[in-house]
Amino acid sequence: MSNSYVLVINSGSSSLKFAVIDSQTGEALISGLGECFGMPEAVISWKYQGEKTEEAITAADHHHQHAINRIVGLMESLGFAQDLVAVGHRIVHGGEKFTSTVRIDEEVLAEIESLSDLAPLHNPAGAIGIQAAMAAFPSLPQFAVFDTAFHQTMPKKAFTGAISHELYKQYGIRRYGFHGTSHYYVSREAAKMLNKPIEQASFISVHLGNGASVCAISNGQSVDTSMGFTPLAGLMMGTRSGDLDPGIIEFLMKKGWSQEKVFETLNKKSGFLGVSGLTSDARGILEAMENGHEGAKLAFEVFTYRVAKYIGSYLIPLDHLDAIIFTGGIGENSLPIRREILGNLKLLGFVEDEKGNEAARFGKAGIIAKSELLNAVAMVIPTNEEFVIAQQSVELL
């Protein structure tokens, strides 16, 4: 076999992202998105050799299956089908059961579905994607890569909530953390860049996108992370509140708010969108700020302050720091946000490398600041979760 390509699938409730990844280089040969599933305007689009194509999905229902069937046709027409060795699925929640990538069988699929209580928006959709891919590619091995798996090395003191232990035993209420595949990838890439064995490297990984989280990594392992039982905890995000006094929920419900309205507000109408009253997009926030928009300025300040607070607190579980790693759409591209976060860390001695910070954008890695006090750097590493999913799938063949 000349190539080892993996079809990587990230299945949402009304969408499906896919890419064919070369498991040796990480190159995406083709990538695409099916969206608006369950609606008349359902479409699938893909990008191949710089050209984008879009098609309507005309079927009345089962849009995940129709999208994956179209992907099969694409693979065959482009000549990739014979080089596909596996299908890798991004699954959001693995609970305590899954600590690493696993080959999917009926038992694993049932376990993923049983964890739907912990991730009601994500795991049922992931299971639908698996079932559709198994029907479309019956002879290909399928693997599940879990967002939570990397964080299963957290010590009890980091993942235990300060509530009745019975709630943990009965319902599994604890910190799980997410973005694990991204934090795993960038920490390995940072260790390579710094020419340091990952087993001896310690990082604070800062994944900033529409969802955002910070992870403390000691000797290559996750020891704490900002997201919690759900991806709602931790940092302020595009539309999510992040950490919040839980008493606010009771307060709003006493004011007549329904449970659904409270959590829709916290998940979809908070964060950048809620504070600015304008947009959930960091680029829109920066643009409005330049035009004197007070809400945008406040959103920028709250966001960068909270990220810096988490970074500072994550020095606690580490015995040394090699680097702060910025990744994710905002972390990789937003120079003003990185600059403000590092400015908030003045006591840690980080001095910006202005040329380095300017250069480390749009897919380029680089060192953007140094601290002589900590003998550490701040750096940008573009994430590549699909590459990890492809690699870890191939490793289990």
Curated annotation (Swiss-Prot):
Cofactor-binding details, from the entry? Mg(2+). Can also accept Mn(2+).
Single GO biological process annotation from the record: acetate metabolic process
Q: Pathway of this protein?
A: Metabolic intermediate biosynthesis; acetyl-CoA biosynthesis; acetyl-CoA from acetate: step 1/2
Q: Where in the cell is it found?
A: Cytoplasm
The protein's required cofactors = Mg(2+); Mn(2+)
> What UniProt keywords are attached to this protein's entry?
ATP-binding, Cytoplasm, Kinase, Magnesium, Metal-binding, Nucleotide-binding, Transferase
Kindly identify the residues recorded as the active site.
Answer: 147
An example Gene Ontology molecular-function term:
ATP binding
Question: What is one GO cellular-component annotation here?
Answer: cytosol
The record lists its disulfide bonds as none
Where on this chain does Mg(2+) bind? 10, 385
- Where along the sequence does the record put site: Transition state stabilizer? 179, 240
Annotated residues that bind ATP are located at 17, 207-211, 281-283, 329-333
The family database entries (PROSITE patterns) matched by this protein are listed as: ACETATE_KINASE_1, ACETATE_KINASE_2
User: What family name appears in the similarity comment?
Assistant: Belongs to the acetokinase family.
Purpose of the protein: Catalyzes the formation of acetyl phosphate from acetate and ATP. Can also catalyze the reverse reaction.
* HAMAP family hit by this protein: Acetate_kinase
Quaternary structure note: Homodimer.
What is the protein's given name?
A: Acetate kinase 2
Organism placement in taxonomy: Bacteria, Pseudomonadati, Pseudomonadota, Gammaproteobacteria, Vibrionales
